[in-house]
Amino acid sequence: MKLFKLAVVGFIILNYIALGCAKAPSQFSDAPSQSLSKFDQKLFARAALHQQKGQIDSAIVLWNKFLQRNPNSFEVRNNLGLLYYANDEIVKAIYHFGQGLKLRPREDQLKMNLVRALKVQSAILEENREYDEAIVDLSRIVQLSPAKEQEAIERQIEALEDQIFKQVKKSDSMGEYQEFLKKYPRSPGNSDEARLWIENKLQAKKMGNQELLSSDFQPSLATE
């Protein structure tokens, strides 16, 4: 567990180098794309300077202040996402990258940053055995990724579905089987097995009820 957490932290640090310190010009936005008032221009410049210097906390404060005045700035959403990512606040990073992508759906850099953050979060969720939540993140990654990368991610999802189904089989519960089918109706192999299990259980219950009715009926005939 400790080794995994260290690996995750190391993963985040390495990605921060890619996303922040050794960033390509398109990763960190140091100039606004829209026209701003002089006050907002100065505020943007101050926040950008703090981020460039690696002053994460103060940069976050300034960018949030700017965002209150300019909520539709996708550049600032991206910059905040990078800062929260570097600060190990993955949930907030995902939120801001996602909001930025809503404002600029075709912005590849935002997509890439969001995917990286989602990968970190899904890995943490998987380690914590929160498989359903990890699958939600991985499914989102599939939607954001190019076709050539989707198959590998879909295999990850299938592997997690296998883990969930193992737990379902251990439970031997009708409710658990039905819930699995509701969430994963097309899980390769697992969904068909779940349907068959439910069908057999219902059939056995039906036969049991018929036998019970038959046994109740026979004594009444004997009495007559």
Where are these regions (language model features)?
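Helix-start (N-cap) detector for alpha-helical repeat units in TPR-like alpha-solenoids
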Residues: 39-41, 74-75, 108, 115, ...
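Canonical tetratricopeptide repeat
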Residues: 79, 113, 120, 154-156, ...
